[in-house]
Amino acid sequence: MEEKLKKALNILNIPVFNLRGDESLPENIVYKVSEVVNSYIDNEEDLIEYRITVVLFIRGGLKRKKDAIKRSLKEHGFLLSYKTPPPLISDRTDIIQQAIECRYYENVSN
């Protein structure tokens, strides 16, 4: 799943990091993945739900870049959250910070 996520996020050719970005770069994308294992009657893993938060740290072109990331995530099988928080803009650095939440489901039952 993580390789698929990285491939989806590389659509903009902006460096992608897990958990912590590189503050020296003018733009980067950071993601965090939480795993939830769902089991049913037999108490064995049946479905893994990945809850993913992607944060864009960009200097401009928010709508175009956000739309490209969302489109790429959908094309790679990720389900987007209906609600996207408003962007945060740093007065000091002109960096726009935009979070995108999505989920991915993996069937692990035999």
Predicted regions: what they are:
Residues 1-51, 57-110:
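Long, contiguous binding/interaction regions
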